[in-house]
Amino acid sequence: MSARAPKELRLALPPCLLNRTFASPNASGSGNTGARGPGAVGSGTCITQVGQQLFQSFSSTLVLIVLVTLIFCLIVLSLSTFHIHKRRMKKRKMQRAQEEYERDHCSGSRGGGGLPRPGRQAPTHAKETRLERQPRDSPFCAPSNASSLSSSSPGLPCQGPCAPPPPPPASSPQGAHAASSCLDTAGEGLLQTVVLS
């Protein structure tokens, strides 16, 4: 039996237990009685040795467990802080973007309200250009009182400086004078054309 004992059991058990298990009970009589005293003392020391070995192994496993838990807690803490920081950064970015958008929108609305709209100025400008072009675009003299001239020679241009268009009917003498000057110039033009022909 002693030769068949596994080596692992020999390494695990303390030497006192190995000595007691593998010792042969050959002593008898007085020898046995004399050996009981030191056996009792040896059993006490053996218990203390076993307790020390168990405490050492338990303490080593406990230290390993504590180290593993600490490492795991550190990893979890670092991941949680990273996620929290990331969420805060996202919230700050969203707030900044919203503030910039609100500022741009407010500035655009204020600028658009203060400046006049270009669509409203276009009709007045067109009216002014039309009023300016009306006296310039009349190269033909068309007095209201020159009916004979229109029947005899329609569409003849005025040679020389032509008088401006007649004023309203309130100023009748000035209109008559303008019509007479236009008639004189038209008559001179007719005479020149007849002589040349």
UniProtKB/Swiss-Prot annotation:
| GO-annotated cellular components | membrane
Listed Low complexity bias regions:
141-161
List the PANTHER family.
CHROMOSOME 11 OPEN READING FRAME 87 (PTHR31870:SF2), SI:DKEY-183I3.9-RELATED (PTHR31870)
The gene name on file is C11orf87
UniProt keyword Transmembrane, yes or no: yes
What is the first-listed, main subcellular location in coarse terms?
membrane
Please note every region of biased composition (Pro residues). Answer: 162-171
Give the way it sits in the membrane.
Single-pass type I membrane protein
Locations of Basic and acidic residues compositional bias? Answer: 96-107, 125-136
Subcellular localization: Membrane
Glycosylation, residue list:
N26
| Keywords, comma-separated and alphabetical | Glycoprotein, Membrane, Signal, Transmembrane, Transmembrane helix
Name of protein: Uncharacterized protein C11orf87
Which stretches are Extracellular in the membrane topology? 24-61
Q: Which residues cross the membrane?
A: 62-82
Q: What is the lineage of its organism?
A: Eukaryota, Metazoa, Chordata, Craniata, Vertebrata
Q: Which InterPro entries match?
A: C11orf87
Q: Does the keyword Cell membrane apply?
A: no
Which domain of life does the protein's organism represent? Eukaryota
* Signal peptide range in chain numbering: 1-23
The residue spans the entry assigns to the Cytoplasmic side of the membrane are as follows 83-197
Disordered: region residues: 94-180
